[in-house]
Design a protein with these regions (language model features):
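N-terminal carbohydrate-binding accessory modules
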Residues: 27-78, 91-92, 266
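Active-site region of glycoside hydrolase catalytic domains
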Residues: 137-252, 257-281, 303-309
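An active-site-proximal structural segment forming one wall of the substrate-binding cleft
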Residues: 58, 66-75, 93-121, 126-155, ...
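The substrate-binding groove and active-site-proximal loops of carbohydrate-active enzymes
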Residues: 50-53, 86-98, 123-133, 159-169, ...
């Protein structure tokens, strides 16, 4: 799994000359953001809790899973990297992490998956925004330099779920600074910026992006109602003891529709594509209810023209069991468009390997 990680991401570099082109016009950049969003289509979050970042200890994610993800019908992977713990006192990132990230991107690209690099240190950032700001700027300066002229299909996501002690104004200021760092040597890179994480869909209206930078996709996450999606979650004192909460009534669906359409209205006003970067329901909920929920979210995102990424491939909320090498079939089938199940060789490959959970 770790063999060859230190070498450059060759497949990413083949078309690296694209990144060296002059900055595109605002209209062309907006077109690129929209095109990238369409190409991302459906995806899945990966590697958030995997030991790959620590050199392979307790690392259940295997190289062959990239092909299995593509064969199942997914078009991108959102790579969850909590990088701050791998930075030294000067905020220099451990070069071994860059080598491991190179390997992940190379495998994604080799399997026709768009890689989204998600800086995932939301806990630390929500608790200590000032320290977060320094680390985030340092991280993206190093990442932008490392991938300048390389891997043009890779997308940079600035930060997972900004919020907590961050104010919208503080986040807007940091976004401007990080974008300046990235644009210095990645003028054509598509970037994802999250709105402040909130259960209120109108919170997105507080996000302020540089009007001249149109190659940006805006991320939102959706887990409402939390009493359903997080019932039984042992890390939550609010929801750990909850059980038996259902989802799927017409009222349930209307609330989701109203929330997402409010976000979509902002998207159309601002001319910014939307990315549903996380959604899902924890395993304690009944499987049929989980399928109804995830299927409805994915279908609604497709109807609105949004790319989406299910949370997550393995560990909790799992779409795949690495201990048995089995997909959670009802969830995968619920996420995918029903009219495309048997229409591609990729789906045929997935179907030949499917097993019941």
């Amino acid at each position: 799994m770790l063999a060859g990680m230190a070498k450059p991401a060759v497949l990413c570099a083949v078309m690296g000359f694209v990144c060296a082109l002059p900055a595109a016009s605002p209209c062309a950049a907006q077109d690129k953001a929209a095109a990238t969003a369409r190409q991302m289509a459906g995806g899945v979050n990966i590697l958030g809790y995997d030991g790959i970042w620590d050199g392979g200890v307790d690392a259940p994610f295997k190289q062959r899973y990239f092909k299995m993800i593509r064969d199942a019908g997914f078009h991108h992977v959102r790579i969850n990297l909590s990088a701050f713990k791998y930075m030294d006192s000067r905020n220099d990132l451990d070069l071994r992490i860059l080598a491991r990230l190179d390997w992940v991107l190379e495998q994604a690209v080799a399997n026709d998956l768009i890689p989204v690099i998600d800086e995932h240190d939301y806990d630390q950032c929500q608790r200590n925004p000032d320290e977060c700001g320094m680390k985030l700027l340092a991280f993206w300066k190093q990442l932008a330099g490392h991938y300048a002229g390389r891997c043009p299909t890779a997308v940079f996501e600035l930060l997972n779920e900004p919020g907590g002690k961050m104010t919208a104004a503080w986040w807007n200021t940091l976004v401007q600074s990080v974008l300046q760092v990235i644009r210095a040597n990645n003028p054509a890179r598509t970037v994802i910026v999250a709105a402040i994480n909130s259960e209120d869909p109108l919170e997105i209206r507080k996000l302020e992006l540089p009007p001249q930078d149109r190659n940006i996709i805006v991320a939102v996450h959706y887990y409402k109602p939390m009493m359903f999606t997080h019932q039984g979650a042992p890390w939550s004192w609010r929801f750990a003891l909850l059980r038996g909460i259902d989802w799927g009534s017409e009222d349930d669906k209307s609330r989701v529709t109203n929330d997402l359409e409010a976000v979509d209205a902002w998207s159309k006003e601002q001319g910014r594509p939307i990315y549903l970067g996380e959604f899902g329901a924890y395993e304690a909920a009944a499987m049929d209810a989980r399928v109804r929920y995830t299927s409805f979210l994915a279908r609604t995102a497709r109807r609105l023209g949004w790319p989406w990424a299910y949370w997550q491939f393995d560990h909790d909320f799992a779409l795949f069991h690495t201990d048995t090498d089995q997909w959670v079939i009802p969830l995968v089938d619920g996420l995918m468009p029903h009219d495309t199940h048997a229409e591609t060789s990729e789906r045929a490959n997935y179907s030949s390997r499917r097993t019941t959970p």
